[in-house]
Amino acid sequence: MANTKGGLVVSKQEMTKMWIDDKFVAVTLVKLLPQEIVRFKTNEKDGYVSAVVGVEKKELNKDKGQKVDYSMVTEFLVDENFLSAHQAGEVLDTNLFDGVSTISVTGQSKGKGFQGMVKRCNIKGWSATHGHKFTRSGGSKGNRKPRRTMKGHPHAGHMGSEQKTIKRIPLLKVLEREGEKLMVVKGSLPGARNSKLKFFVE
């Protein structure tokens, strides 16, 4: 079931470690980006309910007829309670995650280019000795019958640069550093540094 409690757009910063419960825990720091609710989509007009969020509003010259623009416009599925509690033009903040212990994260994974089967599909490979020349090759693609390559067979190809969603990630704390709000989550997150991620309330 999709999350319908809203969310935030953040920027991935760095990984570090924190001392939690008498042990070091690997954590990821993400920075809250300035964002506001542009408008709402409703069942009557659009067939579903969501909040359209604009991230990093750009300063444009209205005298030249330039319209409002954002570096990113996305939307979050919301419920009727979210509609009644928020309005268009409202700036979203980390208080949306007050009392929330776990979140879902969606982002673009790092692109790794064209990779072979050993790295892309995690196959073992072949013997490195006894005169074998094809240690990291794919080998046979199938049997004499059914005379075709079966679906799901590992092959070399493009790896990474895919949308990934990770659920039930522990949200540890919210910090403020140099006027910026940082959120600390346990473990690693998809994407490169400074890439945008979507945090969903679970």
Region spans (language model):
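Extended basic (Lys/Arg/His-rich) segments that typically form rRNA-contacting surfaces
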Residues: 1-202
